[in-house]
Amino acid sequence: MQRKSIGSDGAERLRAISLLSGLTAAECQMLARMVDEVVMEPGEELMHEGDFGYEAVFLEEGSANVVQDGVTINTVGPGDAVGELAVLDTGGTRTASVVATTPLRGLVLTSHFMHHVRQQMPALAEVIDREAAEHRERDRLRASGQPVD
């Protein structure tokens, strides 16, 4: 796994994330300083079930399997986020592992990023919290074997 800062030049990449698309260019430039890029090869583990989580990854390229108790419960790709529940809940244990199935590139947002958003951009924090609640509900449905749209 390779990891590096995207710096303020990554502002447009942040705006491509649907949750952040309403931000101004200046807001994205400020937030980009707190974001890293991760690049992975197939088979590499991005997150491990049971580990403490303090980062979320928004996938830009590639795909990964979400694995819970040894069973693949979802496949994610560009535009999807993984690990955000632990970050939004200000830390917690990972509920699943995430393993790259193709070459993968994504943006890493930390709990520090979310703390800054909550302090400086409360309206955005509300949108993110609402999305997280929907994600939790989808996970609950998926775990109970019910269809998820």
Where are these regions (language model features)?
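Cytosolic regulatory regions built on CNB/CRP/Popeye-like sensor folds
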Residues: 1-149
